[in-house]
């Protein structure tokens, strides 16, 4: 009997602890939501004082992406070339960071800067080929881009971990339902986080943008959106993706560097 009572007391105690923890969590979430609402209202007022309308929907409290370092991967480049040129490839090192792959179907050139170009008869059903490539190599999926003859060209943005890469695109060209060329920026699939602390939050990026606008005298009357993205930078052997906040305005788009705080426009 005493054992049964003891078990009941323990169960009741655990239930009360769970209720307490849930209540504490609910209070914290409510406090956080209230603090975010207040911060948003203050930002809107700050912009209004400068004659700029800031959409509340543009204010986000999500963290920016991490800075990334991408090491060149010649194996991944060869695999990408094989998508269009087949597996029977002849590889050559042309020097200066240039690697080439050739087959009976065409030729692929990859550079240390991340630039690449593949030309030849790269396959029929170009729309399907392009969709598969974009799915495998993190590119935005294009809308309809071919005319009735199966000809046309389209340029899509590169992505990394789901974020757009400014300065990174891939262009596809088709003639008479045959894909003829693929060119643009090739990003290795594997990356290393280079920096994860001290990056500018969205609210800090917005205030940095507002200060830069005031200093430059730029004519901007409304901020319509704010979104994270990457900027592609390259050296002789390393590609770097620097996180940015993109500020969409009624004039031009601006970019705030999450590492340095520098503000630039498109």
PLM regions and their residue ranges:
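Preferential activation on post-signal-peptide N-terminal prodomains/segments
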Residues: 1-144
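Extracytoplasmic/luminal low-complexity segments enriched in Pro/Gly and acidic/polar residues
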Residues: 191-266
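Exposed beta-strand-loop-beta-strand "reactive/processing" segments of non-cytosolic proteins
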Residues: 78-102, 112, 118-119, 136-176, ...
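Generic hydrophobic secondary-structure signal
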Residues: 10, 14-17, 170, 179-182, ...
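Long, charged/polar, surface-exposed segments that mediate recognition or autoinhibition
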Residues: 114-222
């Amino acid at each position: 009997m005493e054992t049964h009572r003891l078990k009941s007391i323990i169960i009741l105690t655990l239930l009360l602890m769970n209720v307490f923890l849930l209540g504490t969590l609910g209070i914290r979430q409510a406090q956080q939501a209230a603090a975010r609402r207040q911060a948003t209202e203050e930002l809107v007022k700050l912009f209004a004082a400068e004659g700029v309308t800031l959409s509340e929907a543009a204010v986000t409290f999500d963290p920016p992406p991490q800075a990334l370092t991408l090491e060149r991967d010649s194996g991944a480049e060869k695999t990408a070339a094989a998508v269009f040129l087949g597996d029977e490839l002849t590889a050559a090192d042309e020097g200066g960071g240039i690697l080439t792959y050739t087959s009976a179907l065409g030729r692929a050139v990859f550079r240390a800067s991340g630039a690449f170009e593949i030309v030849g008869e790269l396959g029929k059903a170009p729309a399907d080929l392009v969709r598969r490539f974009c799915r495998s190599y993190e590119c935005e999926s294009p809308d309809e881009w071919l005319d009735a003859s199966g000809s046309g060209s389209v340029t899509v943005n590169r992505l990394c971990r789901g974020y757009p890469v400014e300065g990174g695109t891939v262009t596809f060209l088709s003639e008479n339902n045959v894909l003829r060329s693929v060119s643009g920026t090739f990003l290795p699939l594997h990356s290393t986080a280079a920096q994860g602390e001290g990056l500018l939050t969205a609210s800090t990026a917005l205030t940095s943008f507002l200060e830069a606008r005031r200093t430059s005298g730029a004519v901007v009357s409304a901020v319509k959106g704010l979104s994270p993205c990457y900027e592609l930078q390259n050296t002789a052997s390393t590609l770097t993706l620097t996180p940015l906040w993109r500020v969409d305005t009624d004039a031009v788009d601006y970019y705030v560097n999450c590492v340095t705080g520098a503000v630039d426009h498109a």
